Curated annotation (Swiss-Prot):
Its EC number is 3.1.3.5. It comes from Campylobacter concisus (strain 13826). This is 5'-nucleotidase SurE. A divalent metal cation binds at D9, D10, S42, N95. Belongs to the SurE nucleotidase family. Keywords: Cytoplasm, Hydrolase, Metal-binding, Nucleotide-binding. Its cofactor is a divalent metal cation.
Length: 258
């Protein structure tokens, strides 16, 4: 029996999480444990909670929410408190929205996969791309097919992942009928506009809402961004070693002792 730990950043009631659970329940020989945040934690990246205690709340057999926790908290604490032996796989998702290009650095979905990798466990992040608030209409049927296609390949070692790497998978905003297939591509490059909306509360105190600016991307070589827009499910291996080897040697010449 293969053990899979799943979490997300949209919270324990998210339809994407339940779709992931349903998809994995259709696979033979797997046992799934869910530990998810008690509320939405989008864009919390790889943050851990170090300034207050965390509490498991059991919802069902093998289904827990972690009170006011981040996705990385869920992975970290599940491994230390619920497992005597490490699970075979950590899966994060299915995220409500894509995690493309530099989204990966903000994403709590990807942050949970990073935590799994840091703990020595193979990990996958799944995200469902959608447009114009169409997620309810689109649903997760194609995403579930993608999960059922990719997950066994990782579990059965058909896909070899290097240590400290995880797979970032984005599902296109289309149906199974119009699905183009799979594209293994690098992460693209987003162009982020700085945007914040200023408001005032009834006492006249100012506050801001961040975000809501349109996201663009740099066109050129095929990437996760371009291919998911063409109807492909994109698969991008992400490594945690962030050293810029291109600059390493030139910097050594300027700073190393003579």
């Amino acid at each position: 029996m293969k053990e899979i730990l799943i979490t997300n950043d949209d919270g324990f009631e998210a339809t994407g999480l339940l779709a992931l659970k349903e998809a994995l329940s259709e696979l033979d020989g797997v046992n799934v444990t869910i530990v998810a945040p008690s509320s939405e934690k989008s864009a919390c990246a790889h943050s851990l909670t170090l300034t207050r205690p965390l509490r498991f709340i059991k919802l069902d057999d093998n289904f827990f929410k972690l009170d006011d926790a981040t996705p990385s908290d869920c992975v970290y604490l599940a491994l230390h408190a619920l497992y005597n032996k490490k699970p075979d796989l950590v899966i994060s998702g299915i995220n409500h929205g894509a995690n493309l290009g530099e989204d990966i650095t903000y994403s709590g979905t990807c942050g949970a996969a990073m935590e799994g990798v840091l703990q020595g466990i193979r990990s996958i992040a799944f995200s469902q791309f959608y447009e114009n608030n169409s997620l309810n209409e689109l649903g997760f049927e194609l995403a579930k097919e993608v999960v059922k296609f990719i997950t066994p390949k990782v579990l059965n070692d058909e896909i070899s992942l290097n240590p400290r790497e995880f797979l970032n998978v984005n599902i296109p905003a289309t149906t199974s009928k119009n699905f183009k297939g799979y594209a293994v591509v690098p992460a693209g490059r987003r162009t982020y506009a700085t945007h914040a909306t200023l408001n005032r509360n009834p006492r006249g105190i100012e506050y801001y809402w961040l975000g809501n600016a349109a996201l663009e991307y740099e066109k050129g070589e095929p990437s996760d961004i371009s291919k998911v827009n063409e109807g492909f499910a994109t698969i991008t291996p992400i490594k945690l070693n962030m050293t810029s080897y291109e600059s390493l040697e030139s910097l050594k010449g300027k700073f190393d002792a003579k």
